[in-house]
Amino acid sequence: MDRRTFLQAVGSTSAVAVAGCAGQSESEPPESVGEWADDGSIEFGLPPFQDAEQLNEQYAPVFEWLADGFDGVDTVKGVQTTSYSATVESVVNGHTEMANLSPIISVLAAEDGVNPLVINWSHGADSYYSYIATHAESDIDALGDIAGSTVAMVDPLSSSGGLFPRYMLTQAGLDAGTVNSQPDDFDIQWAGGHDASLAALQNGHVDAAAYGDFQHPTDDDSIVKVAESDPIPFDPLVAKPNTPDAIQQALIERLLNTPESALEAHRIDRFGEVEEGTYDPVRGVAEEMGVEIETLDPESESDDDSTTNSTSETNESTTNASTSTNESDT
């Protein structure tokens, strides 16, 4: 199955509830962001790293800022997918004009022409970490102790909640499986989100959990960190393939000038430019783990209904949308 066939296969099982497939013809490329938007609406794909209400609140001020910046754009709508692969499918096939992609997905999708626009900066950095944690009273003191345990993870295509934890466990000498198979040395319970992965640990359903450092509790001494990854570049905001350079640049400039009030509600410091080589660390780990988008079988990605390959539209984030909630990382 080649890359394009895989993406079409995901689409055939997706039931993508998104308008906006028509787009512009190749002979008449759009000359403005308003023309590029579908009927005045930019649809923005979001992976399920938090619940829909939180995502809607978090992205609303950024969506408002984008919508207000371009003639012909009436709304920017958040479309939350229920799996990471469905997020990339939606933007690669033009069902959504923009998306927030996990670092690993952005690396894979670049070969399909998905264009990174900006990268998130938070706490003065453009990178974050993957944590593997356990209960304070657990016998798990090091990664090697996870053998024989059950570990909650986010999604096979989550960087901090899937790829990097599996890589760390591999480096510790354990078989960590593939994106399509369970490991030999421990079991993975795919939770579908960073909050759900932590909750599985807190509720005693698993022995350990992997998630982004932003999810780690600061007021719960019963949860302790076992290991953390090397720095992972934050997720980028991207535009669909064949977006003209002038439109990409207009979107970049608008995002780089996002006002402080919107950034505070979005829980980041700022958006920054994507430099050459930014995602090389992610690409390197993906290569070592043998992860390619065409190797991902959408039927075996997860046994959890929360990560089936479909999308559902969040409450529309328009120019009068509300704000607040957690920072987002994948």
Language-model features, listed with the residues they occupy:
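Hydrophobic alpha-helical segments
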Residues: 1-330
